[in-house]
Amino acid sequence: MHYVTPDLCDAYPELVQVVEPMFSNFGGRDAFGGEIVTIKCFEDNSLVKEQVDKDGKGKVLVVDGGGSLRRALLGDMLAEKAAKNGWEGIVVYGCIRDVDVIAQTELGVQALASHPMKTDKRGIGDLNVVVTFGGVTFRPGEFVYADNNGIIVSPQALNMPG
């Protein structure tokens, strides 16, 4: 499904929350949406690696990296694995790397910036917890939609207006 966030905002103004405009689109898929799966981690992408190995059909991984601009929480290998396992997209409140390869990957990816340094893998982080960034709270099981216009969150699945 191709999502257009302005159209969703117009059709469901009482349902959506708009994330502050701080993210850039890096993925090969410009528009994406799905059920939220959250990870909260700081400069450690161990849980990201675990989750992209799982079936992600209809889901978007929302990674609260604390806004760190010192390490990349996603690179080409994990992005390609996520695409292979059916993830709709990944939103990273932090950095990613290998952006040229990720731009060719059939996956939606939005992040704050790119950074060439990988993270440590110490197994530290929390899965499926409520996270807040960009003025919006992301709850597992709710829905997120993203495109070149921005990122929105809804408590229920939204259909594109006909």
Curated annotation (Swiss-Prot):
InterPro entries per UniProt: RraA, RraA/RraA-like, RraA/RraA-like_sf
Q: What class of enzyme is it?
A: lyase
- Catalytic activity, as annotated: 4-hydroxy-4-methyl-2-oxoglutarate = 2 pyruvate; oxaloacetate + H(+) = pyruvate + CO2
Alphabetized, the UniProt keywords read: Lyase, Metal-binding
Pfam families tied to this protein: RraA-like
List cystine links.
none
Residues binding a divalent metal cation are: D98
Query: Which coenzymes or cofactors are required?
Result: a divalent metal cation
Question: In Gene Ontology terms, what is a biological process of this protein?
Answer: regulation of RNA metabolic process
Keyword Metal-binding found: yes
The molecular function terms in GO held by this entry are:
4-hydroxy-4-methyl-2-oxoglutarate aldolase activity; metal ion binding; oxaloacetate decarboxylase activity; ribonuclease inhibitor activity
Q: Which domain of life is it from?
A: Bacteria
**Annotated positions binding substrate:** G75, D76, M77, L78, R97
Q: Which SUPFAM superfamilies match?
A: RraA-like
Q: Does the keyword RNA-binding apply?
A: no
Q: How is the cofactor bound?
A: Divalent metal cation.
Query: What task does this protein carry out?
Result: Catalyzes the aldol cleavage of 4-hydroxy-4-methyl-2-oxoglutarate (HMG) into 2 molecules of pyruvate. Also contains a secondary oxaloacetate (OAA) decarboxylase activity due to the common pyruvate enolate transition state formed following C-C bond cleavage in the retro-aldol and decarboxylation reactions.
* Subunit (UniProt): Homotrimer.
User: Which family is this sequence assigned to?
Assistant: Belongs to the class II aldolase/RraA-like family.
Against NCBIfam families, the record matches this protein to:
NOT-MenG (TIGR01935), PRK09372.1 (NF006875), PRK12487.1 (NF009134)
Query: Which PANTHER family does this entry report, sorted A to Z?
Result: 4-HYDROXY-4-METHYL-2-OXOGLUTARATE ALDOLASE 3-RELATED, REGULATOR OF RIBONUCLEASE ACTIVITY A
Q: What name does UniProt use for this protein?
A: Putative 4-hydroxy-4-methyl-2-oxoglutarate aldolase
